[in-house]
Amino acid sequence: MLQGKQLILATKPFAKENRAKSWYYTISTLLILIASLIGTVYNFHWTLKLACSIFAGLVIVRLFVIYHDHQHKAILDKSPIATAIFTLFGFYVLAPSGIWSASHDYHHKNNCKLFSASIGSFPIYTKKKFEKCSKSERFHYLFIRHPLTILFGYIFAFMYGMCIKSMINRFSKNIDSLIALILHFSYQIAVFYFLEWQTWILLCAIPHFISGAMGSYLFYAQHNFPSVTFVGNEEWTYEGAALDSSSFMKLNPFMHWVTAYIGYHHIHHMNSRIPFYRLPEVWDAIPEMRSAKTTSLKPKDIIACFKLKVWDYEKQKMVGI
């Protein structure tokens, strides 16, 4: 049975992209998104426009995961064309590459450490720490983890968390966050002015709301689920954080397509250089990966994840308050 660093080494053969496949999935997903967005404006009936709007929100999630893989240098690395495409996409979804790369790289190196800064992830307090907090500190902590905050991830995670907060913290290092906000709101104002508010709702509001909510929840649930394990900095290991603190999300084939296999999150955390389309290969090839801790998008699992608030050190599990 493979353990520890042996597991990481076992994944290395899969950390090689098929360049043609990477381009195919990138371009095809981009074209599907463009077609869906066009369908929100030009269509036979408002119900078809609404269907295109909802589907566009889901496709944005897929393209975001592909963008995320490019940021990890798992696909299309050193391609100027790919870099240009994904830079523009990062502006479009309010996740510019500068702050996204910095915060997400930190997340991978510190995933599920109890006593690290909550950069690029949802904060985790121990039960004792929470009890010692002031009312305002408790409110802030619970607000960040609240279901409504995650539902409105477009505003709180992306618009504020990725862009506004990054500029407040370090403006000189995050000029691209300002560019993202300017471009993002310029295109929305143009749509609202020239195509009217009904089109703005279908072309802009619904797709961004759906993708923001789903993206935020996926990121939350993949590290905040009932059987998750958190450890101190001294006990932390990279492979342990992947297997014990990152979930496998059980999804149907369509939702695996929408999420570009990011539900195989424990494998992604074991080796972030594995292209998204090869994650199922690792699942099939390495038996140890199939013993992952799981969650899903079923209502009971979503409720179970949202009930988790603090880490109980004595019980060694996440609990409610």
For the regions a protein language model found, what residue spans apply to each?
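A glycine-rich, aromatic-flanked flexible loop/lid motif
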Residues: 181, 253-260
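Membrane-interfacial segments at transmembrane helix termini in multi-pass membrane proteins
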Residues: 216-254, 297
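Juxtamembrane/interface helices at transmembrane-helix boundaries
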Residues: 50, 196-206, 210-222, 226-230
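Non-catalytic, topology-defining segments of multipass membrane proteins
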Residues: 1-59, 66, 83, 90-205, ...
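Short alpha-helical scaffolding segments that buttress acidic/His motifs in well-ordered protein cores
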Residues: 88-89, 258
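Alpha-helical transmembrane segments and their membrane-interface exit regions
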Residues: 55-63, 209-216
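Histidine-centered catalytic micro-motifs
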Residues: 63-72, 100-112, 218-227, 258-274
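Helix-loop junctions on the outward
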Residues: 70-80
